[in-house]
Amino acid sequence: MSLFQTIMDSVANPNHAGSQSDIQGLANLAQLLPAGQGTEQNIQPILGVLGSYLKSALNQQQQTAGPVAAQQTVTNLAQPGVGVQDLQGLFGQSGLNNLIAEIAQRTGLNSQVIMAFLPMLIPVVMKLLATGTHQTDAQAPNPVLNGFLGSNQSGGELLSGIFQLASQFLRK
């Protein structure tokens, strides 16, 4: 089953936290970038780079602190108001610097634009990963997060694919 299908199943499951607005949020990401810079051609490489860094950071957290800690990070960062300190906590300062540099290299966006965009982008992506969070049982596995972390595909491929499918799904 594809990760997008797992997300759709979680959105349809009343025991899970996801909603259709979580999918809409991902499809509308381009609107968060400053005018003229938010085309799909910039979103795809941003998600490609971010997905790889997210998958690595969350896998590392899951291995060192356990699945509940990784789930809690996803839940915490799915909330509005994520700041630079939260991103430093997730990626480490050097990881965050590398993430910004790699996005800048792939998109041509300057680092200030990227730094302003990431605190808006991370909650949208994390909200999507949190769609499989069980509403009443915090210990229940999150099939979306587990699918993201356990996939043989890179995190970047997964997020880019979900973005494309979400955009197609919402155009129907």
Region roles according to the model:
Residues 1-172:
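A structural "flexibility-hinge" signal
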